[in-house]
Amino acid sequence: MGLKVIQQNVHKFLQLRFWGWWKLYNKVKPLLNVARQEEEMKAKEEELRKAMAQTQELVNKVKELEEKTATLSQEKNDLTIQLQAEQENLMDAEERLTWMMKTKMDLESQISDMRERLEEEEGMAASLSAAKRKLEGELSDLKRDLEGLETTLAKTEKEKQALDHKVRTLTGDLSLREDSITKLQKEKRALEELHQKTLDDLQAEEDKVNHLTKNNSKLSTQIHELEDNWEQEKKIRAEVEKARRKAESDLKMTIDNLNEMERSKLDLEEVVKKRDLEINSVNSKYEDEQSLNSTLQRKLKEHQDRIEELEEELEAERAMRAKIEQNRKREAELLKLRRELEEAALQSEATASTLRKKHVDSMAELTEHVESLQRVKSKLEKDKQVMKAEIDDLNASMETIQKSKMNAEAHVRKLEDSLSEANAKVAELERNQAEINAIRTRLQAENSELSREYEESQSRLNQILRIKTSLTSQVDDYKRQLDEESKSRSTAVVSLANTKHDLDLVKEQLEEEQGGKSELQRLVSKLNTEVTTWRTKYETDAIQRTEELEETKRKLAARLQEAEEAAETAQARAASLEKNKQRLQAEVEDLTIDLEKANAAAAALDKKQRLFDKMLAEWQQKCEELQVEVDSSQKECRMYMTESFKIKTAYEESLEHLESVKKENKTLQEEIKDLIDQLGEGGRSVHELQKLKKKLEMEKEELQVALEEAESSLEVEESKVIRIQLELAQVKADIDRRIHEKEEEFEATRKNHQRAIESLQASLEAEAKGRAEALRLKKKMETDLNEMEIQLDHANKNNSELVKTLKRLQQQIKDLQVQMDEDARQHEELRKQYNLQERRLSLLQTELEEVRSALEGSERSRKLLEQEVVEITEWHNEINIQNQSLLVVKRKLESDVQRISNEHEELISEFRLTEERAKKAMMDAARMAEELRQEQDHCMHLEKIKKNYEVTIKDLQAKMEEAEQLALKGGKRTIMKLEARIKELETELDGEQKQHVETVKTLCKNERRLKELVFQTEEDHKTNQRMQALVEKLQNKLKVYKRQIEEAEDQANQTLARYRKTVHELDDAEDRAGMAETALNKLRTRHRVAGKGITSV
C-alpha cells in the first residue's frame, strides 16, 4: 500500500513538475521556510550528531564485546588450572563457614544486648509519657483556673455595663424632665405672648370704639342737617334714623362686650398669676431634682472610680495568674466588691424608682396644668372670635351706610369679566391638553415601532457580525494550517524518500547478514557433528589414543572458539540490523500515516475553503445591506430625536402656560375673596350679592375641579412623558451598548468612526441626564414656588388685617416701596445675568458647531473606510479567483486538512493537560533515571558475576587439563562431569549476554522516550509563553482603548456639564425674573386696592 502511494506521488510529481503553479510554489516555498531553515538545519545537525554518537557507542560496545569474547576464550583455557585450586577454595570456604558461625554467635549476643537497651529505652519513654500526661493535667487545671478568672472578669464587666446602662437611663430621665421643663417655659412664654396679644387687641378695640364715637358724633351732625331738610327728604331721614338707632344699639353692644372683655382680662391676669406660682413650684421641684441628680452623678463617679480601680486590680491579676494564693485573696476581694456593687445597684435602683415616682407625679401635675391652660386658651380664642365677629359686623353696618350700590355693581362686572377670561383660558388649556394627548399617543406608537425595528436590525447586525468574525477567524486558521501542512508535507516527502533509501540499504545489509548467519549456523552445526564424532571416538579409544585426543581436542577448542566468536559477532550485527530495520519500518509507517492524514486534511480544507468563499460572498452582501439599513435607522433615530426634543419644548411651554394660568387663577381667587368680603358689606343688596356669591363659589368650585382635573391629567402626562423619556434613555443605552460591542468587533477598520459615535452617544446620554436633572430642578423650583405662594398668601392675609389700621398700612406701603426698589435692582441684575447666559449659550453653540464639524469629519473618514472595504472586497474576489485555480492542488490535501482540523481540536482540548503531562513526563524521566541507575548496578553486578565465572572457568579448565592428564587413570566419569559443567557455564554465559543485550535495548528505548518527553515539555512551554505574550498584547490593547474611551467621555461630560450649567442658570434667571414680575404685579394690585380703601375711608 505504501509503495503504491509513493509510486502514485512520484508519477504525479513527474506530471506536474513543469506546471506553472508548481514552479511558483517551488519558488515561494523556500521564501516561506527561510526563517525556519536555519532552525531545521540545526535540528538535523543535532540529530546527525546524536546518531553518529549512538553509532560510535554501538561500535565501541561491539569492540568491547569482541575483546570480552577473546578474554573468555583465554579464561576458558585457564579453567583447567583453576580446577586444582578448587579444593583449596573448598577448604577456605569451610574455614569461612566456621568464621561465619562465630560471627553469627557474636551478632546474636549483640542483638540480645540491643534488645535489653531497647527495653530500657521503652521504660524511659513510658516514664516520660507519664510525666508528660501529668504536666498536661496540670496545664489543663491551670487553664480551668484561667477560664474561671476570665468568667469572673466577664461577669464584673457585665455588671459594670448594667450600671452604665442604669446611669444612662437616669440621665435620659433627667434629660426628659429638662425637656418637659423647657416645654413648660415655652408654654409660659406663649401664654405671655397671648396675653400681650389680647392687650394689643383690646387696645385696637378701644381705638375702634373711639373711631365709632367719632363716627357717632359725625352721624349726629348729619342728623341735625337731616332735621333741617326734614320736609324735603323724609325717606332719607327715616333711613338715617334707623341707621342711627342700629348704630346706637351696636354701640351699646360693643360697650357691653368691652366690659365683658375687661372682666375676662382680669380673669386672665388671675390665671396668669396662678400659672406663675405653679411655674415657681415646678422650678423649685426642678432645682431639687437637679440637686438629687448631682448627688447621683457624684455617686456614679465614685462607682466609676471604684470600677476603674477594680479593672486595674484585674489587670494585675492577669499579670499574676501563676500565683494561686494571691488569686484566692483577690477572689475574696472580688466577692466583697460584688456585694458592694450589688448594694450600690440596689441603692441606685431605689433612688431611680423614687425619682421616677416624682417625675410621674410632676408630669401628671404639669399635664393637668397644660390642659387647664389649653382650656383657658380655647375659651379666650372663642371670646376673641366673637369679639372679632361683632367688630366686623359693626364695621360692615357702618360702611354699608356710606358705600353705595355702584361699587358692588362695578365689582360684579369685574367678576363677570374675570370669569369669562378664566373660562376662555380653561378652554384653551383643554384644547392644548387634547393636542398634547394626541401627540403623545402618536409618539408612543412611533417610538414602539422604531424601537422594534431598531432591535430587529440590531439583532440581525449582531448575528452577521458574529458570523463574519467567526468566518474570518476560521479562514485565518485554515490558511495557517494549510501553510503548516504544506510545509510538513514537503518535509515528510523528503524524509520518506530518505527513509526509503535507508530501508533499501538496510534490506541489502540484512540479506547479506542473514546469508552470513546461515553460513555460520552451517559451520557451527558441522563443528558440532565433528565434536560428537570425535567425542565418540574419544570415548572408544580414550585409553589407546590419549596423545591424538589431546591434539584433536586442542584443535577442536580453537575451532570452537573461532566459531563462537564468529557467531557472537554475527548475532550482534543481526541484532543491530533488526533494530535498525524495526526503527525504519516504524518511521516509514508513521510517515505514511501522516501523509494519508495530510492528504485527507488538505481535501477537507479545500472543501471548507470553497464553502467559506461562498459564505463570505453572501455575508459580505448581507453586511453591506445591513450597513445601509443601520445608516437609515440612525438617520430615522436622529429625526425622531429632533421630534422628541420639539415635543419636549412644546410640553415645557405648555407647562409654563399652565403655571401662568395657575397664577392668574390664584389672583382671581384672591379677587373673588376680596369681592366676597365686599359683598358682605352691602346693605339692601345683601341677598343679591349672596346669590352672586353662591353662584361665584359654584363657578369657583367648578373651576377648581376643572383645574384639579387638568393638573391631575397634566401630572399623568408628565409621568408618562418621564416614563417615555426613561424608556428612550434605556433604549438609547441598549443601542449604545450594542453598537459599542459591534464596533469593538470592527476595531481594525472603523476605530475613528467608533470613537466619534461613542462620544456622540455619551453626549446624548449626558444631555438626556441633563434634561432629567433640569426637569427635577424645575419640579423642585415649582414646589419652592408653591411654598412661596403659600407664604405670600399668609402675607396677604396679614396685609388684609393690617390694612384696617391706617398707620400700619402706610408703614407697609413704605416697606413695599423699598421692596419694589430692591426687586427692580434684582430685576436689573437678572437682566445682566441673562445677557451673560446668552453669551455663554452662544459660546456653547459654537462648541456644538465644532462638535458637528468633527462628526462630519468622522463621517468622511467612515466613507473613506467604506471605500477601502469595497477595494478589499474586490481584492478578495481576485484572491478567490486565484484560489479557484488552486483547487486542483487543494483537493489532494483535503484529507490531510480534515485530519489536521481534528488534531487541532484535539490539541485545543489537550492543551489544558500539557502541564500535567509535563509533570508526568518529569516523573517518568526521574523513574527512568532510577531504572537506568538500577540497570547500571545490575550490569555491574553481572560483570562481577562474569569475572567470577571467568575465574571459575579458568579453574575448571585447569581441572579439565588435570582431568585429561588423569583421564587414563580417572576414567569417563570425571570427563562427563567437567563437560556438563562447561555446558552449564556456557548456557549461563549465553543467558547473561542475552540479558545484557535486552538491558541495552531497554536503556536505548528509555533514553529515546526521555528525549521525546523533554522535547514535548519544551514545546508545551514555548506554546504557553506564546499564548501568554498574545494575552498580554490583547490586554494592553484593551487598556489603550479603555483609556481613549474614558478620555472621550471625560471631554463630552465636561462640555455637557458646561452646557447643563448654562441652561440651569438660564432657567433659574428666567424663573427668578418671572417670580419678581408676578410679585411686582401683586404688590401693585394690592397697592391699588389699599389706595381705593383709603380713598373710600
Swiss-Prot record:
<dbReference type="InterPro" id="IPR014751">
    <property type="entry name" value="XRCC4-like_C"/>
</dbReference>
<comment type="function">
    <text>Has most probably lost the function in masticatory muscles contraction suspected for its homologs in dog (AC F1PT61) and apes.</text>
</comment>
<keyword id="KW-0175">Coiled coil</keyword>
<dbReference type="Pfam" id="PF01576">
    <property type="entry name" value="Myosin_tail_1"/>
</dbReference>
<comment type="similarity">
    <text>Belongs to the TRAFAC class myosin-kinesin ATPase superfamily. Myosin family.</text>
</comment>
<dbReference type="GO" id="GO:0016459">
    <property type="term" value="C:myosin complex"/>
</dbReference>
<feature type="coiled-coil region">
    <location>
        <begin position="31"/>
        <end position="1087"/>
    </location>
</feature>
<protein>
    <recommendedName>
        <fullName>Putative uncharacterized protein MYH16</fullName>
    </recommendedName>
</protein>
<dbReference type="InterPro" id="IPR002928">
    <property type="entry name" value="Myosin_tail"/>
</dbReference>
